[in-house]
């Protein structure tokens, strides 16, 4: 009995020892001593393999280096060829990119770094990861731009590294709590910061503020995880980051859009903007396209044009333009910009920079600003009762523009004199021209002649020439009954002078405005009787008015000269008597007296009316025309 119990105790102790020993076995059944010996053998074999590289490995490395050098040489040659190629398209960046640590650039050191909201001119595609182009800044040369595919891959790698870092840091933190409530907040915060999140930071704050406190910091319970309310709050945030591309395609030349000082369609705003259009046309002659846009291009938001489900909503609304018309106008603007000329839009419906902020146009917004509301109010009232009755609407629009932060505008023209404002705008556009036209790409653009022939609508110098023609016709009609033959002979001498003065004033219009704000603005009286039809006619050169006017005036002049030449030839040919020659002398003396009288009368007429213009309010368009084109 005692022996049997002793044997049982021995078996139990032996079994415990065996279990302890088995704890040190590996997963493959080997013991710890076996694994250590095996690891030593494997380590020795690896050392022996790497310490003696074969000849094939050396030749393979040399081949790789030769291939890399050849690819780099070809990339450099393609980069040089691209310098003279036209711009294929332009993009605005939504992310920032630094090429400092980039090691897979086709030509080392030739990658282009940029910040968010920069503009890039793309010449061509190099491969799936790189484009060839340049940053639109003065002094920046051509280089390699990361493609959207490469930027997306970089973003995914960054997110993956950030998630791994969060995971390892949470494991090493020693927090062994397995409650779902602790995991959910960390997973919410694990999304790494990206450019898309930075852009929509204000939207994110609004969403987080709307979330109740129990969802913002959930308790360790399963209910807070499966709450549909918290899921709904998270979904818009992830949608925003998902659909924000790194680049937005924009026109190759950013179109210039004028806003202010108040609403377009009213005389004060129209006359100031027309003066700037006139200046730009002649200052950048041969380098600028000024076109009128009547469609409501504020409807051309990327979210609307890219989403067919929203088209029906826009079509049913009471908008003045259809989406097809808007899309056509946007395409026309893009086509104009491909010529790399300055593009200026006379957009009837754009009165605020926010109207174009979500479109793909990326315009240069120029704010024509009147700093003092009292000055603007006085200008509106000086335009007559028809404009004064809309005073409140114009003042509210001006106030909304004044409340905008300066960052919404590219240029703010708040000078007191029109000439200074014109020079300010010209300096900005000259700098932009140099930024978009580097010295290395001076070849003519083949798209220029084709596009300008079909798309551009040039602006006439001002409406003044049209108004001058009509006023001149009215003055001619009023004075026609009292005009004698000698006065008809004299007037053609005045008309060529007016035409030459018109040309000189058109070539340098900014020299005509040297007064202060109120005077410089009141000189734009050509828009007193402006209607929609007259605004349309502003884009047609008024050559017909001059041609008809000259035909009417030169006809009697030619008849009179022909009559004189007939008398002289008959006198020379037939040798009339002395009595007849004496009669002709008296007739010529009479004509000379009439010439002097009519010249004196016309001089007094222009001087008197010019003097009246200085002293009066100049409410008629003809007075402003005469003041502009005579005073040089």
UniProtKB/Swiss-Prot annotation:
GO biological process: calcium ion import; chemical synaptic transmission; membrane depolarization during atrial cardiac muscle cell action potential; positive regulation of calcium ion transport; regulation of heart rate by cardiac conduction; visual perception
Modifications the protein undergoes after translation, according to the UniProt entry: Regulated through phosphorylation at Thr-526 by CaMK2D.
Membrane topology: Peripheral membrane protein
Keyword Cell membrane among record annotations: yes
Chain segments annotated as coiled-coil in the UniProt record: none
Ranges annotated as biased composition (Basic residues): 570-581
Gene Ontology cellular-component terms listed: L-type voltage-gated calcium channel complex; photoreceptor ribbon synapse; presynapse
Listed InterPro entries: CAB1-4_N_A-dom (IPR046937), CACNB2_SH3 (IPR035605), GK/Ca_channel_bsu (IPR008145), P-loop_NTPase (IPR027417), SH3-like_dom_sf (IPR036028), SH3_domain (IPR001452), VDCC_L_b2su (IPR005444), VDCC_L_bsu (IPR000584)
Residues of the SH3 domain: 86-155
Residues flagged as site, Required for CaMK2D-binding: 521
Modification type Phosphothreonine: residues: 526
Subcellular location field: Cell membrane, Sarcolemma
Region described as Disordered: 20-64, 162-233, 460-610
SMART domains: GuKc, SH3
Keywords: Calcium, Calcium channel, Calcium transport, Cell membrane, Ion channel, Ion transport, Membrane, Phosphoprotein, SH3 domain, Transport, Voltage-gated channel
Biased composition (Polar residues): 38-57, 462-473
Major subcellular site: membrane
Composition skew (Low complexity), residue ranges: 27-37, 169-181
One GO MF term: voltage-gated calcium channel activity involved in regulation of presynaptic cytosolic calcium levels
Pfam families: Guanylate_kin, VGCC_beta4Aa_N
Tissues of expression: Predominantly expressed in heart, aorta and brain.
Residues recorded with modification Phosphoserine: 176, 179, 190, 522
Biased composition (Basic and acidic residues): 532-569, 582-595
Role noted for this protein: Beta subunit of voltage-dependent calcium channels which contributes to the function of the calcium channel by increasing peak calcium current. Plays a role in shifting voltage dependencies of activation and inactivation of the channel. May modulate G protein inhibition. May contribute to beta-adrenergic augmentation of Ca(2+) influx in cardiomyocytes, thereby regulating increases in heart rate and contractile force. Involved in membrane targeting of the alpha-1 subunit CACNA1C.
Subunit structure: Component of a calcium channel complex consisting of a pore-forming alpha subunit (CACNA1S) and the ancillary subunits CACNB1 or CACNB2, CACNG1 and CACNA2D1. The channel complex contains alpha, beta, gamma and delta subunits in a 1:1:1:1 ratio, i.e. it contains either CACNB1 or CACNB2. Interacts with CACNA1C. Interacts with RRAD; interaction may be involved in beta-adrenergic regulation of heart rate and contractile force. Interaction with RRAD regulates the trafficking of CACNA1C to the cell membrane. Interacts with TMIGD2. Interacts with CAMK2D. Interacts with CBARP. Interacts with CAMK2A.
Designated name of the protein: Voltage-dependent L-type calcium channel subunit beta-2
Annotated source species: Oryctolagus cuniculus (Rabbit)
């Amino acid at each position: 009995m005692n022996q049997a119990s002793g044997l049982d105790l021995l078996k139990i102790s032996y079994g415990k020892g065996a279990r302890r020993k088995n704890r040190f076995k590996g997963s493959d059944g080997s013991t710890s001593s076996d694994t250590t010996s095996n690891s030593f053998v494997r380590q020795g074999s690896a050392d022996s393999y790497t310490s003696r590289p074969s000849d094939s490995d050396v030749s393979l490395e040399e081949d790789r280096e030769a291939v890399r050098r050849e690819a780099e040489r070809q990339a450099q040659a393609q980069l040089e060829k691209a310098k003279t190629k036209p711009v294929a398209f332009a993009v605005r960046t939504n992310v920032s990119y630094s090429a400092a640590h980039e090691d897979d650039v086709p030509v080392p050191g030739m990658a282009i770094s940029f910040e968010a909201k920069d503009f890039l001119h793309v010449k061509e595609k190099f491969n799936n990861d790189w484009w060839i182009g340049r940053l639109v800044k003065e002094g920046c040369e051509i280089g390699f731009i990361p493609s959207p595919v490469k930027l997306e891959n970089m973003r995914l790698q960054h997110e993956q590294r950030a998630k791994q870092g969060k995971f390892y840091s949470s494991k090493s933190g020693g927090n062994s709590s397995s409650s779902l409530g602790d995991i959910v907040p960390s997973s919410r915060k694990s999304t790494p910061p990206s450019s898309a999140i930075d852009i929509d930071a204000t939207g994110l704050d609004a969403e987080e503020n709307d979330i109740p406190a129990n969802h913002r910091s959930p308790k360790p319970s399963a209910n807070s995880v499966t709450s549909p309310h918290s899921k709904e709050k998270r979904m818009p945030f992830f949608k925003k980051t998902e659909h924000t591309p790194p680049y937005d395609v924009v026109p190759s030349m950013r179109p210039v859009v004028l806003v202010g000082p108040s609403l377009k369609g009213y005389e004060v705003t129209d006359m100031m903007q027309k003066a700037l259009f006139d200046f730009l046309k002649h200052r950048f002659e041969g380098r600028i396209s000024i076109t009128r846009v009547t469609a409501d291009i504020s409807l051309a938001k990327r979210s609307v044009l890219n989403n067919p489900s929203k088209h029906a909503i826009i079509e049913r609304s009471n908008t003045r333009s259809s989406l097809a018309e808007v899309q056509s106008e946007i395409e026309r603007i893009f086509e104009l910009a491909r010529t790399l000329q300055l593009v200026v839009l006379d957009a009837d419906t754009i009165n605020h920079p926010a109207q174009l902020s979500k479109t793909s146009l990326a315009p240069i917004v120029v704010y024509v600003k009147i700093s003092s509301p009292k000055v603007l109010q006085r200008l509106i009232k000086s335009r007559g009762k028809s404009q004064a009755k809309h005073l409140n609407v114009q003042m509210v629009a001006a106030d909304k523009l004044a409340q905008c932060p300066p960052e919404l505008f590219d240029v703010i023209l708040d000078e007191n004199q029109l000439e200074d404002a014109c020079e300010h705008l010209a300096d900005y556009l000259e700098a932009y021209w140099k930024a978009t036209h580097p010295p290395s790409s001076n070849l003519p653009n083949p798209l220029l002649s084709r596009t300008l022939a079909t798309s551009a609508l040039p602006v006439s110098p001002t409406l003044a020439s049209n108004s001058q023609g009509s006023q001149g016709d009215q003055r001619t009609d009023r004075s026609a009954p009292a005009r004698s033959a000698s006065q008809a002979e004299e007037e053609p001498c005045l008309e060529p002078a007016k035409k030459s003065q018109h040309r000189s004033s058109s070539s340098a219009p900014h020299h005509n405005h040297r007064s202060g704000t109120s005077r410089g603005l009141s000189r734009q009286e050509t828009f007193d009787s402006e209607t929609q039809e007259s605004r349309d006619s502003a884009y047609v050169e008024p050559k017909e008015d001059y041609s008809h006017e000259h035909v009417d005036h030169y006809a009697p002049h030619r008849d009179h000269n022909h009559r004189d030449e007939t008398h002289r030839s008959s006198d020379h040919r037939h040798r009339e008597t002395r009595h007849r020659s004496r009669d002709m002398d008296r007739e010529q003396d009479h004509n000379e007296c009439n010439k002097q009288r009519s010249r004196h009368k016309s001089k007094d007429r222009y001087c008197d009316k010019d003097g009246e213009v200085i002293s009066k309010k100049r409410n008629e368009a003809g007075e402003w025309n005469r003041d502009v084109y005579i005073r040089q």
